[in-house]
């Protein structure tokens, strides 16, 4: 059995503790539960693995084109699709013959599982991403300018194999864009000034769009990053000095919280999607 490292003290979650493995194995090895089997021993404690199986396919391609000696243009695309299976499985029955898992809604009275069987949860998610960008750079002896713009779209799906419906939940695609630009001006051979600005949108992660029960957040806000940098640089044969001011802001952060109100569809729990957190 699990015991606190210091006798008489109580602990929660990740805390100092010891486990009497011999006692657990002895208990599992002589535990007949006639509700499930009259000949095999039921394990009340086991070891389990958390598994995450992922298959990802994609294509990244870009094209460089020199418009002139001073101007270079680059265009690119980024396509990726991923399927991820999330589950837990029985790793060791610790002396018993089987374990009873109650997580599958398709077996409300308990499901007999053995070594390697899925327990606790079993779901599959997909992430489909496509992006494109255009970038240009203009470079002369006195001035250097660059700019880029990009757009991307991402879509999520979720399927819970432990639910009765086993419905494929699909969230609407989310579109984001970003723009960045900057430049450097050489005042003379040693002194230069520079500035950079940027605006980037980041889509919410899957967990902030589709929750564990398959509920979908409609029109979630993209997270937004803005940045500004201005500065100067001086270089000589003896010394190099660089100074700059940098500011970045992160707005519309997304969070998902469960609260107990008694007003949710289940009668006791609501899922609240918090957007616009600054």
Feature locations, PLM:
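Transmembrane beta-strands of outer-membrane beta-barrel proteins
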Residues: 1, 74-78, 146-150, 196-198, ...
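Surface-exposed loop/turn segments flanking beta-strands in extracellular/periplasmic regions
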Residues: 5, 9, 17, 21-39, ...
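Signature of Gram-negative outer-membrane beta-barrel scaffolds
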Residues: 46, 72-188, 203-205, 209-213
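Membrane-embedded beta-strands of outer-membrane beta-barrel proteins
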Residues: 59-61, 132-134, 179-181, 218, ...
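Outer-membrane beta-barrel channels and translocator barrels
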Residues: 68-70, 140-143, 186-190, 225, ...
